[in-house]
Amino acid sequence: MAESILNGKKILAVDDEPDVLKVLEEEIMDGCPKCTFDTATSFEAASALLDSKSYDIVILDIMGVRGFDLLDIAVKKDLKVAMLTAHALSPEALKKSYEMKARAYLPKDKLGEIVPFLEDVLTTDF
């Protein structure tokens, strides 16, 4: 198997559900053990990490932890952002996130596909 392009990358995952973060960490670290993986369960913690560290990609829970505010911060830092969705987004939420430059969405029931999903996010020019 080819080495993942995620190896060596710095990833921040933000979700108010610790179980989701645990699954993300297991999936990502299994698929690319040489990447750096940080987590945050609140807006404040995520904002502090975004201010103090550099990341290659940020995974955000769009509806929790003030996801739209964090999306705005990440986009202003020119970071690649992947949005997690627990349910189908309302047309209003989808439109708002798209207008804010979110381009990649993954349903939480597909977390087992996170590594190839993030590889696509990193290699696609939105």
Would you name each region that the model predicts?
Residues 7-19, 24-28:
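Conserved acidic segment of CheY-like receiver
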Residues 58-73:
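Conserved phosphotransfer microenvironments
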Residues 51-53, 73-80, 100:
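Conserved phosphotransfer cores of two-component systems
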Residues 4, 18, 25, 39-57, ...:
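Acidic, metal-coordinating helix/loop segments flanking the phosphotransfer/catalytic sites
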Residues 26-31, 49, 96:
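Alpha-helical interaction/dimerization surfaces of two-component signaling modules
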Residues 84-86:
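Hydrophobic/aromatic residues positioned on beta-strands within the core alpha/beta folds
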Residues 69, 76, 88-107:
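Alpha4 helix (beta4-alpha4-beta5 surface) of REC/receiver domains from two-component response regulators
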